[in-house]
């Protein structure tokens, strides 16, 4: 499957298929220098896949740590200075090969290197099907997640589904959260469909039919970002589960998707109070437990820490905490939420996720 953004200018292709990595050569052949920025785990599992590229004298490989620990000022500065040792021109391309963190990090490097060089996203996880599309790049701060960054479009997204074959279950769980999120934002039929396909850990672990849900997720996101690239309005809806989820992730260091799933349960609880919805919280909590999400980790949290991190959320305004809530499946809205409601929801969350 190949999609194309439809901005007024600076558009890029999104190639999603098995063996898509073979397309990379076409996109990097005209650059003076190309740097493959590769997640250490991906390099370990697919080293031979990258060797033919390294036979070219203008293509280099840089191995970076896997996961969020890479997205720090220290790694950013070290990698930036290392790249500058190569006497670069603006006809340079960085290729992010790894999960969402690798793409975020590499894209931010590209946005600031020589005031902007090209970069290409080569996502290798389910989670990165979401983060690789849309041009959000950045690193973390001591004050919170993704607080330093930019909107910077890649020249291409090349998503080779063969990379998913080596994913451990923990990584599958993390990625599934974003796929499930897109279903919640789409509506009841989409949720019923995905829950039927992935009703148990064993079914999710098999990844049978995951391709079709990845396609749907990318198409859904593309429809949003074309209309609201800079997150002024409807793109905020893609942050469903992320206000509380980012706080959980930053505090506990559990994978992004695990935290977002907990954040999704939290927003259901908040919505039932604030919007008088009737979501069956126990049903969704049990679904997470069946898939083996580490939901018990909420017992280790305290509200004051979570509130502190939620205050740093980029959706907030002068009125305080802004959360994406579902009025019903497929119908999101951004709501101001009072602290008293957040406290009650936190207590209810700890009860339902025991």
UniProtKB/Swiss-Prot annotation:
Its EC number(s): 4.2.3.4
GO molecular function per UniProt: 3-dehydroquinate synthase activity; metal ion binding; nucleotide binding
One Pfam family recorded for the sequence: DHQ_synthase
Reported cofactor(s): Co(2+); Zn(2+); NAD(+)
Keywords associated with the record: Amino-acid biosynthesis, Aromatic amino acid biosynthesis, Cobalt, Cytoplasm, Lyase, Metal-binding, NAD, Nucleotide-binding, Zinc
Pathway noted in the entry: Metabolic intermediate biosynthesis; chorismate biosynthesis; chorismate from D-erythrose 4-phosphate and phosphoenolpyruvate: step 2/7
Cofactor note: Binds 1 divalent metal cation per subunit. Can use either Co(2+) or Zn(2+).
Superkingdom as given in the UniProt entry: Bacteria
Gene Ontology terms: biological process: amino acid biosynthetic process; aromatic amino acid family biosynthetic process; chorismate biosynthetic process
Enzyme class: lyase
Binding annotation for NAD(+): 100-104, 124-125, 136, 145, 163-166
Positions that bind Zn(2+): 178, 242, 256
Subcellular location: Cytoplasm
Catalytic activity: 7-phospho-2-dehydro-3-deoxy-D-arabino-heptonate = 3-dehydroquinate + phosphate
Main subcellular location: cytoplasm
PANTHER family according to UniProt: 3-DEHYDROQUINATE SYNTHASE, 3-DEHYDROQUINATE SYNTHASE, CHLOROPLASTIC
NCBIfam families per the UniProt record, alphabetical: aroB (TIGR01357)
Family: Belongs to the sugar phosphate cyclases superfamily. Dehydroquinate synthase family.
HAMAP family in the cross-refs: DHQ_synthase (MF_00110)
Record function comment: Catalyzes the conversion of 3-deoxy-D-arabino-heptulosonate 7-phosphate (DAHP) to dehydroquinate (DHQ).
Name the UniProt record assigns to this protein: 3-dehydroquinate synthase
Organism: Staphylococcus haemolyticus (strain JCSC1435)
Gene it is expressed from: aroB
